[in-house]
């Protein structure tokens, strides 16, 4: 699984039983947040709070305003975690694997519809790279 020159893998996020991330996700989060360590910590705490809900509730989390199914995506079906009252309007796109585990794919700030379109394309490219593993196996 390669994006650019790097091997792309899925990593389990410590502290959760069913939450994973594409290996590139932490860097995308940090790039989105910029260099302000205080802001990084604050938004990471917020994200982890909602990842705990996602870990516990699975698909039922979609009943909450922080979670949404991206209707324009059917194959694959993508989902997003959103921070409704955030000043930076950050979003985290993920997918369900086998209906149970969630895999975080990308993080971005939504300033316009084009930002969402770009992030969806990015998430699909990451997913494609994950599915096309070097050993011929898929997710």
Predicted feature residues:
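Basic, Lys/Arg-enriched alpha-helical interface segments
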Residues: 1-89, 98-102, 109-139
């Amino acid at each position: 699984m390669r994006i650019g020159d790097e091997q792309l893998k899925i990593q389990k996020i410590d502290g959760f039983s069913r939450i994973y991330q594409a290996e590139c996700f932490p860097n995308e989060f940090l790039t989105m947040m910029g260099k302000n360590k205080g802001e990084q910590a604050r938004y990471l705490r917020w994200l982890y709070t909602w990842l705990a809900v996602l870990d516990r509730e699975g698909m039922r989390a979609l009943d909450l305003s922080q979670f949404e199914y991206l209707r324009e995506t059917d194959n694959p079906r993508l989902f997003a975690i959103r921070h409704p009252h955030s000043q930076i309007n950050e979003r985290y796109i993920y997918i369900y694997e086998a209906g149970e585990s969630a895999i975080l794919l990308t993080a971005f700030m939504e300033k316009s519809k084009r930002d969402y379109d770009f992030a969806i394309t990015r998430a699909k490219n990451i997913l494609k790279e994950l599915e096309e593993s070097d050993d011929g196996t898929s997710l």
